[in-house]
From Swiss-Prot:
Alphabetized Gene3D superfamilies for the sequence: Nucleotide-binding domain of ferredoxin-NADP reductase (FNR) module (3.40.50.80), Translation factors (2.40.30.10)
InterPro entries given in the database record: CBR-like (IPR001834), Cbr1-like_FAD-bd_dom (IPR008333), FAD-bd_FR_type (IPR017927), Flavoprot_Pyr_Nucl_cyt_Rdtase (IPR001709), FNR_nucleotide-bd (IPR039261), OxRdtase_FAD/NAD-bd (IPR001433), Riboflavin_synthase-like_b-brl (IPR017938)
Cellular localization per UniProt: Mitochondrion outer membrane
GO CC terms in record: mitochondrial outer membrane
EC number(s) per entry: 1.6.2.2
Transmembrane segments annotated in the record for this chain: 14-30
GO biological process terms, semicolon-separated: ergosterol biosynthetic process
This protein's name: NADH-cytochrome b5 reductase 2
């Protein structure tokens, strides 16, 4: 049943698109495919080789909304784990009828110990070549994957507290961190998640995020922002994530506090400034710079 499948997200086996389907993804994917941020080969893991594309078969496709699906792919062996760590992403690839490769990075939010299969929540974007291709896959068809690419290697209690600022499908690496921290009883890191979307219906993984926040009330805070909503029914924030809100919610800059940012270009511009490339964080600008944060205090996925 659909409810059963969604409930499994609470022990998150899920993957969702990395930072949205933007034109920037094309350049990023090409750079990722030749980068050195890969995990060395290990047995019992499906994704271990930076030079090997692995075809996985789609076993289940479940409609969640008009433009979002839950897809389940089988790993190479039923006893395999994915080989992913927090925080890392995979590349996906398909070949167009004209013979062109379409490659996009996707961020996993799956439990690193999950065996046998890997799940995605895919949001279809207008004009998005990869999201449209994946969205239209039929059960029994395959998709090519490669990786994992390590973005930030999380260690328990790296910081006393962190802030996760995201928008849209940029929630994926942030959720990955949130889940990893709260799944480890020895990790006491406090987490403040600030997540923006167009409407309440666009919020990915909301039930799973809310469940984590409810279970870890002394460790996790969550703030939702939407552009528009029925004010009589919506209990979150309406409007943009502002500098004034961040000034009120964030801790003062320091070595024990880290801010992680992931989202569409507009969010980066307003909050932190964009990355130059997958390996170049670029200069810190935007609201965080205005609030006194320095480059070393912020990580952009």
């Amino acid at each position: 049943m659909l409810t059963h499948h969604l409930s499994k997200l609470a022990t998150p086996k899920f993957l969702v698109p990395f930072a949205g389907a933007t034109a920037l993804s094309i350049g990023l994917a090409l750079q990722y495919s030749t980068s050195n941020n890969y995990i060395a080969n290990e047995t019992g893991k499906t994704f271990t080789d930076s030079n090997e594309w692995v075809d996985l078969k789609l076993s289940k496709s479940i409609d969640l909304t008009h433009n979002t699906k839950h897809l389940v792919f089988k790993l190479k062996d039923e006893n395999d784990v994915s080989g992913l760590i927090t925080a890392s992403c995979l590349l996906t690839k398909f070949v167009t009828p004209k013979g062109n490769n379409v490659i996009r990075p996707y961020t996993p939010v799956s439990d690193v110990n999950q065996s046998g299969e890997i799940d995605f929540v895919i949001k279809k974007y207008d004009g998005g070549k990869m999201s449209s291709h994946i969205f239209d896959l039929k059960e029994g068809e395959t998709l090519s994957f490669k990786g994992p690419i390590v973005k930030w290697k999380w260690e328990p209690n790296q910081f006393k507290s962190i802030a996760l600022i995201g928008g849209g499908t940029g929630i994926t690496p942030l959720y990955q961190l949130l889940h990893q921290i709260t799944s480890n009883p020895k990790d006491n890191t406090k987490v403040n998640l600030i997540y923006g979307n167009l409407t309440p219906e666009d919020i990915l993984l909301k039930k799973e995020i809310d469940a984590i926040a409810s279970k870890h009330k002394d460790q996790v805070k969550v703030h939702y922002f939407v552009d528009k909503a029925d004010e009589k029914k919506w209990e979150g924030q309406i409007g943009f994530i502002t500098k004034e809100f961040l000034q009120k919610e964030l801790e003062k800059p320091g070595s024990d506090f880290k801010v992680f940012v992931c989202g569409p270009p507009g969010l980066y511009k307003a909050i932190s400034g964009p990355k130059v490339s997958p390996t170049d964080q670029g200069e810190l600008t935007g609201a965080l710079k205005d609030l006194g944060f320095e480059k070393e205090h912020v990580f952009k996925f």
